[in-house]
Amino acid sequence: DVYKRQVVASRPGVYALERAANAGVEGVVVRRKDYASSEDFDAALLKTLKEHNIDLVVLAGFLSVLGPSVIEAYPRRILNIHPALIPSFCGPGMYGLRPHEAALARGCKVTGATVHFVNEECDGGPILLQKAVDILPGDTPEVLQKRVMEQAEWKLLPKAVAMVCSGEIC
């Protein structure tokens, strides 16, 4: 099998682009603000993906919601990692520190991360994997975010990609 990889970032200067360059993987930036409409952004993103024959899209810190044309072009071929145990602390506006702030404000004892397929509903696609992470006394949103990344996100996402690529999940 031949795998073509490409990193598409939603903003310049992100660490993913540096990592891609260091690994010899092409990186491009497609920023929503560079386009007059969401539809134009989606068309540019789709064009980039199609030009590079991308079969699987993995969202990791891509802070733009994908529109219907992208989702329809990649049914059950777009993975997203979310920094909470869906269905908790998810949906529009729940990104970055916000899920961690919400979990702490609610007094939760555990949080975690979820890998799911992307569909038309924000964070509403079928769940592939989840991993719980303890919330410790004195946690701040920043400390919790780092723990969730290290203990859950960085483990779940590669596992989910491998499962999809091997055909274990389709």
Regions found by a protein language model. Name each.
Residues 10, 56, 60-170:
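Donor/substrate-binding cores of folate-linked one-carbon enzymes
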